[in-house]
């Protein structure tokens, strides 16, 4: 199977965020291809390598949790947005901001044109990205996350309006990463890129749909080890960005 981490993430999400190995194995058999004779051991190995609770953790992706070793009960590691993540209608995106023609208010409003992208909907979650060409240190980086709370069409005399088809999203549940993820600290393969460089990784319109395992990777890496947020401290960080 090509993407074990993504498949296991999908299985746990469909199971309500948590499942025993005895429940995971049948789903792997259904979704997997060319599993091989040792597929159960491979399943456990992929869970362990992507879980900081385990001695076998790779030290990079941290998307699964095992609260009690030997229990066989695995769950998604959701530092935030658990309710939204478990809603199977929620999709996940990387939204690029900070462009030269900057119409957005980070952590408040995000603007785009539906003629170029019409995938994002209310309730979706996203990771914020600053592109390399406008970054002060000449590296792109991920600096926060949020939820698309509602959509509205801007008035033609507002700063958000430029052309027919423009639409705005109001952002809720903003999270400012205490640990921004810089280009130098990750590799294309961390986001399942097939190239050695970052060329073609992100779309030209600044809105890239990603799988849940990639969203959790970036969210958990950016938020660090904390499981609960100090709302006042997070609000200060978001406004200071």
Which positions does each model-derived feature cover?
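Short beta-strand-centered aromatic/proline hotspots
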Residues: 138-152
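Contiguous surface segments at macromolecular interaction interfaces
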Residues: 76-88, 99-102, 114, 153-241
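Flexible coil/turn residues that form the inter-helical turn or adjacent wing/linker of helix-turn-helix
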Residues: 17
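Short, basic/aromatic beta-hairpin or loop at an interaction surface
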Residues: 91-107
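Phospho-regulated, low-complexity intrinsically disordered regions of nuclear gene-regulatory
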Residues: 1-14, 22, 29-89
């Amino acid at each position: 199977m090509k993407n074990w981490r993504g498949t296991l993430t999908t299985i746990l999400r469909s199971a309500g965020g948590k499942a025993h190995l005895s429940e995971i194995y049948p789903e792997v058999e259904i979704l997997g291809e060319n599993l091989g004779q040792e597929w159960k051991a491979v399943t456990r190995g992929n869970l362990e390598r992507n879980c900081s609770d385990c001695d076998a953790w790779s030290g990079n992706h941290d998307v699964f949790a095992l609260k009690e070793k030997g229990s066989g009960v695995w769950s998604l590691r959701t530092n935030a947005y658990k309710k939204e993540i478990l809603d199977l209608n929620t999709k996940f995106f990387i939204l690029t901001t900070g462009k030269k023609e900057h119409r957005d208010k980070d952590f408040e409003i995000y603007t785009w044109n539906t003629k170029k992208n019409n995938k994002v909907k209310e309730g979706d979650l996203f990771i914020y990205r600053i592109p390399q060409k406008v970054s002060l240190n000449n590296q792109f980086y991920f600096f926060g996350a949020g939820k698309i709370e509602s959509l509205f069409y801007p008035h033609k005399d507002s700063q958000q309006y430029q052309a027919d088809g423009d639409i705005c999203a109001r952002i809720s549940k903003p999270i400012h990463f205490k640990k921004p993820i810089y280009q130098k600290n990750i590799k294309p393969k961390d986001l399942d890129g097939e190239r050695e460089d970052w060329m073609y990784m992100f779309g030209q319109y600044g809105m890239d749909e990603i799988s849940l395992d990639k969203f959790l990777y970036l969210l958990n890496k950016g938020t660090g080890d904390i499981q609960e947020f100090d709302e006042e401290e997070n609000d200060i960080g978001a406004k200071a960005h």
